[in-house]
Protein backbone atom coordinates (compact mmCIF):
# COMPACT_ATOMS: atom_id res chain seq x y z
CA UNK A 1 0.00 0.00 0.00
CA UNK A 2 2.74 2.48 0.93
CA UNK A 3 4.73 1.67 -2.20
CA UNK A 4 1.61 2.19 -4.32
CA UNK A 5 0.96 5.55 -2.65
CA UNK A 6 4.58 6.57 -3.22
CA UNK A 7 4.79 5.46 -6.85
CA UNK A 8 1.45 7.02 -7.79
CA UNK A 9 2.57 10.44 -6.52
CA UNK A 10 6.17 10.24 -7.69
CA UNK A 11 5.71 12.04 -11.00
CA UNK A 12 3.82 14.88 -9.31
CA UNK A 13 6.56 15.29 -6.70
CA UNK A 14 9.26 15.42 -9.38
CA UNK A 15 7.32 18.04 -11.31
CA UNK A 16 6.96 20.25 -8.24
CA UNK A 17 10.70 20.05 -7.63
CA UNK A 18 11.39 20.96 -11.25
CA UNK A 19 9.34 24.16 -11.10
CA UNK A 20 10.59 25.26 -7.66
CA UNK A 21 12.52 28.51 -7.96
CA UNK A 22 14.75 27.40 -5.09
CA UNK A 23 15.08 24.28 -2.97
CA UNK A 24 14.44 25.08 0.69
CA UNK A 25 13.39 23.27 3.85
CA UNK A 26 9.79 24.02 2.90
CA UNK A 27 10.46 22.21 -0.39
CA UNK A 28 11.56 19.11 1.51
CA UNK A 29 8.36 19.18 3.58
CA UNK A 30 6.22 19.66 0.47
CA UNK A 31 7.96 16.80 -1.33
CA UNK A 32 7.15 14.46 1.55
CA UNK A 33 3.57 15.69 1.66
CA UNK A 34 3.13 15.13 -2.06
CA UNK A 35 4.59 11.62 -1.96
CA UNK A 36 2.79 10.31 1.11
CA UNK A 37 -0.42 12.33 1.49
CA UNK A 38 -2.50 9.28 0.57
CA UNK A 39 -0.88 7.09 3.24
CA UNK A 40 0.14 9.20 6.27
CA UNK A 41 -2.16 11.79 7.79
CA UNK A 42 0.94 13.62 9.02
CA UNK A 43 2.63 13.73 5.59
CA UNK A 44 4.68 16.90 5.19
CA UNK A 45 5.04 17.45 8.95
CA UNK A 46 8.48 17.00 10.47
CA UNK A 47 9.34 15.37 13.80
CA UNK A 48 9.34 18.72 15.59
CA UNK A 49 5.58 18.71 14.94
CA UNK A 50 4.75 15.01 15.19
CA UNK A 51 7.10 13.80 17.95
CA UNK A 52 8.95 16.77 19.47
CA UNK A 53 9.90 14.83 22.62
CA UNK A 54 11.17 11.66 20.92
CA UNK A 55 14.69 10.54 19.97
CA UNK A 56 14.99 8.51 16.78
CA UNK A 57 17.78 6.02 16.21
CA UNK A 58 18.65 2.94 14.18
CA UNK A 59 20.44 -0.22 15.23
CA UNK A 60 21.20 -1.89 18.53
CA UNK A 61 22.68 0.09 21.43
CA UNK A 62 26.43 -0.52 21.52
CA UNK A 63 26.58 -1.67 17.90
CA UNK A 64 29.11 -0.11 15.51
CA UNK A 65 26.18 0.43 13.16
CA UNK A 66 24.13 2.30 15.76
CA UNK A 67 22.99 5.61 14.29
CA UNK A 68 21.60 8.51 16.28
CA UNK A 69 19.63 11.03 14.24
CA UNK A 70 19.37 14.75 14.88
CA UNK A 71 17.12 15.93 17.68
CA UNK A 72 13.78 17.41 16.54
CA UNK A 73 14.71 21.02 17.32
CA UNK A 74 17.81 20.79 15.11
CA UNK A 75 16.31 19.04 12.06
CA UNK A 76 15.93 22.22 10.02
CA UNK A 77 19.49 23.27 10.86
CA UNK A 78 20.87 20.03 9.41
CA UNK A 79 18.80 20.25 6.22
CA UNK A 80 19.52 23.96 5.76
CA UNK A 81 23.24 23.34 6.12
CA UNK A 82 23.07 20.64 3.46
CA UNK A 83 21.14 22.98 1.18
CA UNK A 84 23.72 25.70 1.77
CA UNK A 85 26.48 23.37 0.59
CA UNK A 86 24.39 22.31 -2.40
CA UNK A 87 23.84 25.91 -3.50
CA UNK A 88 27.47 25.98 -4.67
CA UNK A 89 27.68 23.77 -7.79
CA UNK A 90 31.33 22.85 -7.29
CA UNK A 91 30.78 21.95 -3.64
CA UNK A 92 27.69 19.95 -4.50
CA UNK A 93 29.64 17.81 -6.95
CA UNK A 94 32.56 17.34 -4.53
CA UNK A 95 30.37 16.81 -1.47
CA UNK A 96 27.32 15.00 -2.82
CA UNK A 97 27.72 12.41 -0.07
CA UNK A 98 28.13 15.04 2.64
CA UNK A 99 24.88 16.68 1.55
CA UNK A 100 23.04 13.35 1.51
CA UNK A 101 24.52 12.51 4.91
CA UNK A 102 23.24 15.76 6.40
CA UNK A 103 19.75 15.12 5.04
CA UNK A 104 19.80 11.55 6.35
CA UNK A 105 21.13 12.65 9.75
CA UNK A 106 18.33 15.21 9.98
CA UNK A 107 15.79 12.40 9.47
CA UNK A 108 12.96 14.92 9.27
CA UNK A 109 10.04 12.48 9.23
CA UNK A 110 8.81 9.42 11.07
CA UNK A 111 8.88 7.49 7.79
CA UNK A 112 9.56 8.10 4.12
CA UNK A 113 12.79 10.00 4.74
CA UNK A 114 14.99 8.17 2.26
CA UNK A 115 12.64 8.46 -0.66
CA UNK A 116 11.97 12.13 0.04
CA UNK A 117 15.60 13.15 0.34
CA UNK A 118 16.50 11.03 -2.69
CA UNK A 119 14.21 13.14 -4.89
CA UNK A 120 15.48 16.40 -3.39
CA UNK A 121 19.09 15.27 -3.80
CA UNK A 122 18.48 14.30 -7.45
CA UNK A 123 17.10 17.77 -8.14
CA UNK A 124 20.10 19.42 -6.46
CA UNK A 125 22.49 17.28 -8.52
CA UNK A 126 20.64 18.26 -11.70
CA UNK A 127 20.94 21.94 -10.87
CA UNK A 128 24.65 21.43 -10.21
CA UNK A 129 25.11 19.83 -13.64
CA UNK A 130 25.52 16.12 -12.91
CA UNK A 131 23.60 13.01 -11.90
CA UNK A 132 24.18 9.96 -9.72
CA UNK A 133 23.46 6.49 -11.12
CA UNK A 134 21.42 5.38 -8.11
CA UNK A 135 20.19 2.23 -9.84
CA UNK A 136 23.81 1.06 -10.07
CA UNK A 137 24.34 1.35 -6.31
CA UNK A 138 23.84 -1.63 -4.03
CA UNK A 139 21.50 -1.29 -1.07
CA UNK A 140 23.72 -2.78 1.63
CA UNK A 141 26.88 -1.01 0.45
CA UNK A 142 25.10 2.32 0.20
CA UNK A 143 23.40 2.04 3.59
CA UNK A 144 26.68 1.04 5.22
CA UNK A 145 28.43 4.06 3.70
CA UNK A 146 25.53 6.27 4.75
CA UNK A 147 25.64 5.03 8.35
CA UNK A 148 29.40 5.58 8.44
CA UNK A 149 28.93 9.08 7.00
CA UNK A 150 26.45 9.98 9.73
CA UNK A 151 28.66 8.59 12.49
CA UNK A 152 31.92 10.03 11.09
CA UNK A 153 30.90 13.18 9.17
CA UNK A 154 34.42 14.58 8.71
CA UNK A 155 35.87 11.63 6.79
CA UNK A 156 34.14 12.03 3.41
CA UNK A 157 33.01 8.40 3.40
CA UNK A 158 29.83 8.87 1.38
CA UNK A 159 31.52 11.41 -0.92
CA UNK A 160 34.03 8.71 -1.85
CA UNK A 161 31.34 6.09 -2.35
CA UNK A 162 29.12 8.23 -4.57
CA UNK A 163 32.02 9.44 -6.75
CA UNK A 164 31.94 5.99 -8.35
CA UNK A 165 28.42 6.68 -9.63
CA UNK A 166 28.63 10.30 -10.81
CA UNK A 167 27.45 10.66 -14.40
CA UNK A 168 26.66 13.49 -16.82
CA UNK A 169 23.36 15.21 -16.25
CA UNK A 170 20.37 12.91 -16.80
CA UNK A 171 17.31 13.89 -18.82
CA UNK A 172 14.34 14.52 -16.56
CA UNK A 173 12.21 12.22 -18.72
CA UNK A 174 14.34 9.31 -17.48
CA UNK A 175 14.03 10.02 -13.77
CA UNK A 176 10.82 8.14 -13.08
CA UNK A 177 12.14 4.87 -14.48
CA UNK A 178 15.53 5.40 -12.85
CA UNK A 179 13.99 5.82 -9.40
CA UNK A 180 11.70 2.81 -9.72
CA UNK A 181 14.66 0.68 -10.84
CA UNK A 182 16.68 1.40 -7.70
CA UNK A 183 17.17 -1.79 -5.73
CA UNK A 184 14.34 -1.90 -3.20
CA UNK A 185 12.18 0.76 -4.85
CA UNK A 186 10.63 -1.54 -7.45
CA UNK A 187 7.99 -2.85 -5.05
CA UNK A 188 9.55 -6.30 -4.71
CA UNK A 189 11.00 -5.69 -1.24
CA UNK A 190 9.19 -5.00 2.01
CA UNK A 191 12.03 -2.73 3.09
CA UNK A 192 12.90 0.29 1.03
CA UNK A 193 16.44 0.73 -0.21
CA UNK A 194 16.30 4.33 0.95
CA UNK A 195 14.38 3.77 4.21
CA UNK A 196 16.28 1.06 6.02
CA UNK A 197 14.83 -1.13 8.76
CA UNK A 198 13.14 -0.12 12.00
CA UNK A 199 13.75 3.02 13.99
CA UNK A 200 13.54 3.05 17.76
CA UNK A 201 12.20 6.08 19.63
CA UNK A 202 13.08 7.19 23.16
CA UNK A 203 12.24 10.20 25.30
CA UNK A 204 14.53 12.98 24.13
CA UNK A 205 15.14 14.68 27.49
CA UNK A 206 16.35 11.64 29.46
CA UNK A 207 20.01 11.65 30.59
CA UNK A 208 20.83 8.77 28.23
CA UNK A 209 19.37 10.53 25.20
CA UNK A 210 21.00 13.84 26.11
CA UNK A 211 24.37 12.08 26.36
CA UNK A 212 23.89 10.67 22.87
CA UNK A 213 22.97 14.07 21.47
CA UNK A 214 26.02 15.58 23.15
CA UNK A 215 28.23 12.97 21.48
CA UNK A 216 26.76 13.78 18.08
CA UNK A 217 27.05 17.53 18.65
CA UNK A 218 30.75 17.11 19.39
CA UNK A 219 31.30 16.02 15.78
CA UNK A 220 30.94 19.63 14.59
CA UNK A 221 28.90 19.02 11.45
CA UNK A 222 27.84 22.61 10.97
CA UNK A 223 30.90 24.66 10.13
CA UNK A 224 30.65 28.43 9.83
CA UNK A 225 32.30 28.38 6.40
CA UNK A 226 31.44 25.08 4.66
Residue ranges, per PLM feature:
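FIC/Doc superfamily catalytic core
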Residues: 1-111, 115-226
Amino acid sequence: MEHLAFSSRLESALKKLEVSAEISYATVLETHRTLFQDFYHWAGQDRLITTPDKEISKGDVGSDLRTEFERPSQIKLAVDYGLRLASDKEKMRAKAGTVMGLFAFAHPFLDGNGRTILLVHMELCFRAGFSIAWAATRKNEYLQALSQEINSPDEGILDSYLKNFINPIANRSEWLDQILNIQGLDGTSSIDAMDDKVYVAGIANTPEMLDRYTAQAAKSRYKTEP
